[in-house]
A protein has these predicted regions:
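Long, charged, low-complexity intrinsically disordered regions
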Residues: 1-77
Length: 77
């Protein structure tokens, strides 16, 4: 299932909390793919990676054509 979260312009603490709750809920679907829109804020993107995506060991990539987005997929355990 595909999910999309737009965090652009959101306060960083609220954005981290929202990303975490959506990714945890979405992770129950083994075919999950979530597009997280951070905008061009390198700080927000790095914090989402460091505080949500990496600790939960999700797979992710940042598309070269849209660096304000993180694509997250489920890592099979």
């Amino acid at each position: 299932m595909k999910f999309k979260i737009d965090l652009h312009g959101m306060p960083i603490t609220k954005a981290i909390s929202k990303a975490e709750s959506v990714l945890i809920e979405a992770s129950f679907d083994k075919n999950m793919q979530c597009e997280i829109i951070t905008g061009k804020s390198g700080n927000m993107q790095q914090r989402i990676l460091d505080e949500v995506i990496k600790p939960y060991k999700f797979d992710y990539y940042i598309p070269p054509h849209n660096t304000g987005t993180i694509i997250v997929t489920q890592n099979e355990l």
